[in-house]
């Protein structure tokens, strides 16, 4: 009997996390199900009922972390078995399309550079580059000595550029 994504406890969450990268990562529904099952097994090992949480609430709070770690372990296994070309290795290492580092994937490198080129001044370019490198809003504000509100505004601008360019180029 074949599992369905909605039958697995973490299946829908895994599908939601990787919805932007199905095509580029070449993930099938079975891959997503296996990621979700692996994450569920891992969470069962680490679950401790002494803290007063039910298992379902524990999954709601920590499910995304377990899914990401099981995906990384799956990618590492693939990398060990199949290290054909530099491109495939680069694709495996850089495209972990969780919402945080979705912008750093290879597919959107061109979009990011075009959005970066739309920046009107040096401050915008610095904020954009730090954001793409993985810094959080508050860290960017501290580093560049500007207000967090200004950082939020500039990042919203950057994300709107990316959204516009994404729609234009059909990614």
UniProtKB/Swiss-Prot annotation:
One of its GO terms (molecular function) is DNA-binding transcription factor activity. SUPFAM superfamilies: Sigma3 and sigma4 domains of RNA polymerase sigma factors (SSF88659). GO terms for biological process: DNA-templated transcription initiation. Disulfide bonds: none annotated. InterPro entries: RNA_pol_sigma-70_dom, RNA_pol_sigma_r3/r4-like, Tscrpt_reg_LuxR_C, WH-like_DNA-bd_sf. NCBIfam families: sigma70-ECF. This is Uncharacterized protein MG428. It comes from Mycoplasma genitalium (strain ATCC 33530 / DSM 19775 / NCTC 10195 / G37).
